């Protein structure tokens, strides 16, 4: 893609300016310009709405679980397979997504991804059998693949290293807010227009948002920044911005011990997150005999806890770094503590005797796992060279979603064979704890630019 010379209203967030406009401040002093503030605000608002729509899409099948099973005659294992095939397609698509994102940037990648995942979401409302559903779920998984790597890339591009904690928490919280508002919103939509109308409506909204993203957002390399703006954005960064990775450099990441620690560790986080995302409404309906309306309200509560965990993480990591703790160490502490606590709460869930007790325990498990997960993405910002962030993020996501793809189908199979979620929750807690151990023993050194090795 050629570099754009943007000539728009000077009040716009993305108006270019000559590097000679403002001198670089002396003595290392950096300032955030009004234009950079507007760019950051615009980018974060667009990412927020994209993340909410993204998780409305992901939650739709979970909320409509029992209704779709009855209409299409599907078993719990088949529903689990539909949930798993999405995750598997999403994970595999992460591999080409990273290098493409490093080359094409978030504007094109997220715009196209959002358009196609929303198109397949709308098509989900038109299926009539299991095979058709599998195909549209695969399409959705591929389309959604750029979402998180694009978010990481946008934040890495438009915030300097000391100010990325809160925007990362905000971005991640948006996804959980999407999950939290999904059950009551989707349940209400189903009561009014049925599950088919729900899928189609959400898909159309996503298509409009995709068009808005492409029209409003600009990649950093396509904006002519002043010297002061460059100084602000690069402040504290050890690694300079360079050319995208070659295939050989990308392949070399799989020989890096820290990369494997991130892959295995984040797999523990995504297994837990995806199990609850896929099966929480079904669990509440099956274990506690809740109706659709009550399920919609109760299922929202744990995900609000998860959103809170993401937001709290941003403040905690920024506070630790400003207090003198090394950025990598601050993220690792949050990751490991959050994962062990989440595992403990998940293991206690089967002991709950009331739906409210179960919801609160799951809420604490999600608070802790999303607290940890936010630092996993934050770790990429501080432990990885800038030109490699998208590739590392996509590889991490690839591994974690391959692992997470087993959670729905394993859970569905266990429910079909034991008529209980107990064993599925125990397995989940153990996987989470194993992920924490991967961060302890494998993630010890930053991932440096191979050109400097």
From Swiss-Prot:
PROSITE patterns: MFS (PS50850). Residues 1-23 are annotated as: Disordered. Coiled coil: none annotated. It is found in: Cell inner membrane. Keywords: Cell inner membrane, Cell membrane, Membrane, Sugar transport, Transmembrane, Transmembrane helix, Transport. One of its GO terms (biological process) is aldonate transmembrane transport. The chain crosses the membrane at residues 43-63, 72-92, 108-128, 175-195, 197-217, 260-280, 296-316, 333-353, 360-380, 395-415, 423-443. Residues 1-42, 93-107, 196, 281-295, 354-359, 416-422 are periplasmic. GO terms for cellular component: plasma membrane. Residues 10-20 have a biased composition (Polar residues). Residues 64-71, 129-174, 218-259, 317-332, 381-394, 444-453 are cytoplasmic. It catalyses: L-galactonate(in) + H(+)(in) = L-galactonate(out) + H(+)(out). GO terms for molecular function: transmembrane transporter activity. Disruption phenotype: Cells lacking this gene fail to grow on L-galactonate as sole carbon source. It comes from the Bacteria. It is a multi-pass membrane protein. Probably responsible for the transport of L-galactonate from the periplasm across the inner membrane. Is essential for growth on L-galactonate as the sole carbon source. Belongs to the major facilitator superfamily. Phthalate permease family. This is Probable L-galactonate transporter. It comes from Escherichia coli (strain K12). The gene is lgoT.
């Amino acid at each position: 893609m050629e570099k754009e010379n943007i000539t728009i209203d000077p009040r716009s967030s993305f108006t270019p300016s000559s590097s000679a406009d403002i001198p670089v401040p002396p003595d290392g002093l950096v300032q955030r310009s009004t234009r950079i503030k507007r760019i950051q605000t615009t980018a974060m608002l667009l990412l927020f709405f994209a993340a909410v729509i993204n998780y409305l899409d992901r939650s739709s099948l979970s909320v409509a679980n029992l209704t779709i099973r009855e209409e299409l005659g599907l078993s719990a294992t088949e529903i689990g397979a539909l949930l798993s095939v999405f995750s598997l397609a999403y994970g595999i698509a992460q591999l080409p997504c990273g290098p493409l994102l490093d080359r094409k940037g978030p504007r094109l990648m997220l715009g196209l991804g959002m358009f196609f995942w929303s198109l397949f979401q709308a098509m989900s409302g038109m299926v009539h059998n299991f095979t058709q559903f599998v195909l549209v779920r695969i399409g959705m998984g591929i389309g959604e693949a750029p979402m998180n790597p694009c978010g990481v890339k946008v934040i890495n591009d438009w915030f300097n290293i000391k100010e990325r904690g809160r925007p990362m928490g905000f971005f991640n919280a948006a996804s959980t807010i999407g999950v939290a508002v999904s059950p009551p919103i989707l349940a209400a939509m189903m009561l009014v227009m049925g599950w088919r109308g729900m899928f189609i409506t959400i898909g159309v909204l996503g298509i409009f948002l995709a068009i808005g993203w492409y029209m409003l957002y600009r990649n950093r390399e396509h904006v002519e920044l002043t010297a002061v703006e460059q100084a602000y954005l690069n402040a504290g960064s050890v690694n300079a911005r360079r050319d995208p990775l070659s295939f050989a450099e990308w392949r070399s990441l799989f020989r890096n011990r820290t990369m494997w620690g991130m892959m295995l560790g984040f797999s523990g986080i995504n297994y837990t997150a995806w199990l609850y995302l896929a099966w929480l409404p079904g669990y509440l309906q099956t274990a506690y005999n809740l109706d659709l309306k009550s399920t919609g309200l109760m299922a929202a509560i744990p995900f609000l806890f998860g959103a809170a965990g993401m937001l709290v993480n941003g403040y905690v990591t920024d506070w630790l770094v400003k207090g003198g703790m090394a950025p990598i160490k601050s993220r690792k502490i949050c990751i490991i503590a959050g994962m062990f606590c989440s595992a403990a709460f998940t293991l206690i869930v089967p002991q709950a005797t009331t739906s409210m007790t179960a919801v609160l325990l799951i809420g604490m498990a999600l608070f802790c796992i999303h607290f940890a997960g936010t630092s996993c993405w934050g770790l990429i910002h501080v432990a990885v060279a800038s030109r490699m962030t998208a590739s590392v993020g996509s590889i991490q996501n690839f591994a974690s979603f391959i692992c997470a793809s087993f959670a729905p189908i394993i859970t569905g199979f266990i429910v079909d064979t034991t008529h209980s979620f107990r064993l599925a929750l125990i397995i989940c807690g153990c996987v989470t704890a194993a992920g924490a151990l991967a961060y302890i023993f494998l993630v010890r050194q930053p991932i440096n630019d191979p050109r400097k090795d």
